[in-house]
From Swiss-Prot:
Entry protein name: Centromere protein H
Native species: Bos taurus (Bovine)
Matching PANTHER family: CENTROMERE PROTEIN H (PTHR48122:SF1)
Biological process terms in GO annotation: chromosome segregation; kinetochore assembly; mitotic spindle organization
Described purpose of this protein according to its UniProt entry: Component of the CENPA-NAC (nucleosome-associated) complex, a complex that plays a central role in assembly of kinetochore proteins, mitotic progression and chromosome segregation. The CENPA-NAC complex recruits the CENPA-CAD (nucleosome distal) complex and may be involved in incorporation of newly synthesized CENPA into centromeres.
Length: 244
C-alpha cells in the first residue's frame, strides 16, 4: 500500500498554470524526475520482496551461516540506500516544481502587465527583480543538488567500505572455523592420541621423581628454607605438572 501511494504521488502531473509554452516546459522538465522516482520505487519494492522471500527461506533453517548473515545485511543496506534516494528525488522534484511555478507565474504576470498598461514601470521593475531573485534561487538550488549528489557519493563509498570490512570479517571467521576444524581433526587422530599418552606417562614418572626428591630433602632434616638454592628446588618440586 505504501509503495502504491508513493507511485501515485510521484506520477501526478504538475499543474499546467496558464496557456502557452511555459507549462509544456514544466511538464517536460518534470518528466525525468518522475521517471527516476518511479524506477526507484519499483526497485525498492522488488528489493523488499526479495528480502521477505529470503527471510522466509532462512527461517526454515535452524541456524544462519555467516554468508547468509552477510547477504541479509547487504540487502538491508541496499533498501536503506534506495529509500534515501527516493526521498532525495521527491524533495528535488518538489523544489524544481515550486521554482518553475514561480517563474511561470512571474512571466505570465509580466506579459499581462505589458498588455494592460505599458506605463506601469514600478510593477515592471518589481517583476524584473522577482525574476532575478528566482534565477538566484534556481542557482542556489542547483548548488544544493550538487552538494547532495556529492553527499550521496560519500555515502555510497562508506557503504562500500562497510561491505568490504564485513567481507573481510567473514573471511577471518571462515578461516577461524577452518582452523578449529583442522585442530579437532588432529585431536581425533591416532598420532595425537599416542603423543598424549606418552606425555601423560612422562608426567607420571616425573611426578614420582619429584616425590622421591621431596622425601629425601625432608628426611635429611636439612633447613632448606634458609638455603635460597635449596628453597627454590623444593618449590619447583611442588609444582603440579598436569597443570602446565
Amino acid at each position: 500500500m505504501e509503495t502504491q501511494s508513493e507511485e501515485q504521488a510521484v506520477t501526478k502531473p504538475a499543474d499546467s498554470g496558464g496557456e502557452g509554452g511555459p507549462p509544456q516546459v514544466a511538464g517536460a522538465q518534470a518528466a525525468r524526475p518522475e521517471d527516476r522516482m518511479t524506477l526507484l520505487l519499483r526497485l525498492r519494492a522488488q528489493t523488499k520482496q526479495q528480502l521477505l522471500e529470503y527471510k522466509s527461506m532462512v527461517d526454515a533453517n535452524e541456524e544462519k551461516t555467516p554468508e547468509q548473515i552477510m547477504q541479509e545485511k547487504q540487502i538491508e543496506a541496499k533498501i536503506e540506500e534506495l529509500e534515501n534516494e527516493v526521498e532525495e528525488a521527491k524533495t528535488a522534484f518538489e523544489m524544481k516544481k515550486l521554482a518553475l511555478d514561480r517563474m511561470q507565474l512571474s512571466t505570465a504576470l509580466k506579459k499581462h502587465l505589458e498588455k494592460v498598461d505599458i506605463k506601469t514601470s514600478v510593477l515592471m521593475d518589481n517583476m524584473k527583480q522577482i525574476l532575478n531573485l528566482n534565477k538566484l534561487i534556481m542557482k542556489s538550488q542547483q548548488e544544493t543538488w550538487d552538494l547532495e549528489e556529492k553527499l550521496l557519493d560519500v555515502r555510497k563509498k562508506r557503504l562500500q567500505l562497510k561491505q568490504a570490512s564485513e567481507r573481510k570479517l567473514l573471511e577471518i571467521q571462515t578461516e577461524k572455523n577452518k582452523q578449529k576444524d583442522d585442530l579437532d581433526s588432529m585431536e581425533n587422530s591416532d598420532k595425537i592420541k599416542a603423543i598424549q599418552q606418552n606425555l601423560e606417562t612422562e608426567i607420571q614418572i616425573t611426578t614420582v621423581i619429584q616425590h622421591v626428591f621431596q622425601n629425601l630433602i625432608l628426611g635429611s632434616k636439612v633447613n632448606w628454607a634458609e638455603d635460597p638454592a635449596l628453597k627454590e628446588t623444593v618449590l619447583q618440586l611442588e609444582k603440579n605438572l598436569t597443570m602446565i
